[in-house]
């Protein structure tokens, strides 16, 4: 079973109306199709193929990570618009230097998947390549994906990186 936001739904509304904003899906035994388990049909996110491919990768690698969080943190996404930050580990080092918690919550740093069409198999494949080395992957000009053993672990990585990005933005604006 998987719980994902619905197509066109926003995470900020899940708390107040979960069953109107989320889709619960059951994958068939042979993995060839899924059923939506809900009183009201909510079509799953268009990024479902990426999420499922990431889960398949994690299971195949025997990783303990069971949760995939994908969100669109404004300051982190903004940083991916700067080509210099897209080079290997540049963004990680900048964000680690902002507050000590960033290295504590995200010790591997973050990988970068170059721009691809959201929901595409190519984007999923690029993300999986990065997950060999990182637990957080930025999707250039789109969002972030984090994996964790539980929801809190995955969320905390993105939240802490977002805080560091906001601090970086504020520090730069001060001159």
Model-found features: residue ranges?
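Glycine-rich flexible loops
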Residues: 1-175
């Amino acid at each position: 079973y998987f719980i994902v936001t619905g197509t066109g739904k926003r995470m900020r509304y899940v708390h107040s109306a979960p069953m109107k904003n989320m889709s619960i899906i059951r994958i068939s035994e042979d993995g060839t199709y899924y059923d939506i388990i809900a009183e009201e049909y909510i079509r799953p996110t268009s990024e479902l193929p990426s999420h499922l491919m990431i889960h398949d990768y994690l299971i195949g690698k025997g990783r303990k990570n069971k949760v995939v969080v994908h969100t669109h943190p404004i300051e982190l996404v903004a940083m991916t618009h700067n080509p210099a930050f897209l080079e290997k580990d540049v963004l990680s080092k900048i964000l680690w230097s902002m507050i000590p918690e960033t290295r504590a919550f995200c010790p591997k740093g973050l990988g970068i998947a170059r721009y691809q069409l959201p929901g595409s198999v190519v984007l999923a494949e690029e993300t999986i390549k990065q997950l060999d080395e990182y637990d957080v992957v930025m999707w250039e000009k789109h969002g972030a994906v984090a994996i964790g053993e539980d929801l809190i672990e995955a969320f905390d990585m993105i939240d802490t990186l977002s805080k560091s990005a906001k601090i970086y933005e504020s520090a730069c604006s001060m001159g």
